[in-house]
Amino acid sequence: MSSRITKQRLEDLLDRINQATGHKLEAWTQDETGRNRANVGTYVLDWAYGGVRLSQLTNEGGGERDITGRGTKRETYYRMHAFLDGLDAGQRGE
C-alpha cells in the first residue's frame, strides 16, 4: 500500500530542492520600497487545472520556466525526487 502524497510532502521536497541548489525557500521578498520581488532561481510549485508542476522563477516579476510537466501530486512527487537525485549525483560528480 502506498502512502498518500499531500501538498505538505510536495512542499517539503521543494524545500530540499531549493536547499540543495542554494536558493531561497521563499518565492517572494519585499524590497525596501515595499514592492514584492520574485527570488530569481527559486523553485516553486505551480498549481493549476487540477494538477501541479515544478517550475523555477526566472525574473523579478515572477516569470517561470517549467522543470516538469503538470501532473498529479504523485506524478510530480516522483519527478521531483528524480530531479533531486540528479542534483545529488551531479554534486557527487557521478
What positions do the PLM features span?
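Negatively charged, low-complexity tracts enriched in Asp/Glu with abundant Ser/Thr
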Residues: M1-G41, T58-Y78, A82, G90-E94
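Short, charge-rich amphipathic interface segments used for partner binding and complex assembly
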Residues: Y43-G50, A82, G86
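Short aromatic-glycine-(Arg/Gly/Cys) micro-motifs in beta-strand/loop hairpins
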Residues: L45-G63
